[in-house]
């Protein structure tokens, strides 16, 4: 039988389309506003790379002059992708301000956060050094500014400066050691030990706010779970247990550390 014309259904369909359109424009407006804010910051002056990370102190004056010409200042909005896992390596980055997450996607597109970077950290260099695709993804955890250097120019510096090459080897060795420790932490420790380890890692990277108790990092529970190799519900439940035991206090995304030594003990015992 032919379908009868239904005016209510037609109006409902139009209403849904209108709501979707409004939602899309709002989302676009938020994104553009974020881009506008970080574009305004492009006028800010950032010190040369060699004044921010000791890796570059090994450069000669001539190499520093060339690096200043070659490096680019780039801004990323919150959650904007910097590079994808499997993408051809093109740049080495150094974070200037903001925070960046390095992660891999597993089954069901579940993210495993490998590292959270702080200002002046260098990333993307391993893939560029061996001319391989990136083996992880990087995205802006919050609006951030970076220096980036093309792969060929980075490799040319390494090949022409033995001291710089040695410093890159040291940096790679430290990152490898960190990865080995994290592998043990995430596979052998129990849930409490893994979460305590993640909280201590955030504390080491970002420190406290002015009150000397609150972590200077607003991390959603999902991201904290992805750092700790557990489900979001387990992360929420374990945080609540820590709060009940007086180890920390929760206020939305704010986490106040009340007993750092107890967290260290839980992390150590696993």
Identify the function of each model-found stretch.
Residues 63, 115-177, 181:
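Cyclic-nucleotide recognition modules
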